Amino acid sequence: MAESEQKNEHSVGSEGASEAGDPSAQAKAAVDATTADAQAVDAGETTPAPADSAAEGTKREVEPVPVDEPQSFPVTVIIRRYDPEVDDEPRWVDYDVQMFSTERILDALHRIKWEQDPSLAFRRSCAHGVCGSDAMRINGKNRLACKALVKDFDVSKPIYVEAIKGLPLEKDLIVDMEPFFDSFREIQPFLQATGKPEKERHQTIAQRERFDDTTKCILCAACTTSCPVFWTDGQYFGPAAIVNAHRFIFDSRDEAAQVRLDILNDREGVWRCRTTFNCTDACPRGIQVTKAIAEVKQAMMTGVKL
């Protein structure tokens, strides 16, 4: 009897050992365990935990929170139109466009031109406030259309758009920029130094900072065409030309500072400035234009670079 029990125990132990080392037996046990868990869940006895490993699957993704879609709204844009082939004088034309708060006045002009009136004429290029080609007068203030956000205006009232003042009007929002660039070229806006250097011309941080502000000019003409002196006297050099002269007058590498000071020491030069700060307010690059003009005046009187 004892011998029989020992044989049975040996048999059971052998079967257990066989199952522990048998892969098919392990797989069967895993399936049985999964089935048991599923039955427990169906019976409401437990809640399954999310799988954490690659073998068991990935965690359940969290549903995204719904976001309200941005809503458009109507905006009335009134543009001062002028076609030299048809009009004797400029005229105001109303346009209603659907806009979003994050859009810009340039987007409104595009929408009008592409969807309502393809004859509308205006300049634009980069649309990122770098080229300076889309300067215009918006609600009585010179701005770049690509930087004027709709949300910054009271859209319960019309937005008025017209060409910048003081330069010859060609069509709609386009003016003749040649008088502006003539003044710019006259102040010799380029580095002038004698001889070829043996190595690059170095500057200290302080020397660079001396004229850093005026290097930001993008020649958009917003400052010059906001100047009341320029409106009444188109021969005045204007703020933009003086700003670009400042950029080289105070450059330690340049040797023609006095040449530019002599050019600006003219009845149409810096002394025509009346310090109204219109130019500083209009500059889309944040240049302290009035300050730069004052520094050129002081350099002209003292004969030295500040």
Where are these regions (language model features)?
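Glycine-rich phosphate/adenylate-binding loop and adjacent beta-alpha elements
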Residues: 138-161
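Short, contiguous acidic and Ser/Thr-rich linear segments
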Residues: 91-104
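N-terminal intrinsically disordered, low-complexity tails
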Residues: 5-71
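Short strand-turn-strand beta-turns centered on an Asx-Gly dipeptide
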Residues: 80, 98, 137-140
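Ferredoxin-type iron-sulfur electron-transfer modules in oxidoreductases and energy-metabolism complexes
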Residues: 102-118, 157, 162-306
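Eukaryote-biased recognition of intrinsically disordered, low-complexity regulatory segments
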Residues: 72-94
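Short, structured protein-protein interaction patches enriched in aromatics and acidic/basic residues
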Residues: 126-135
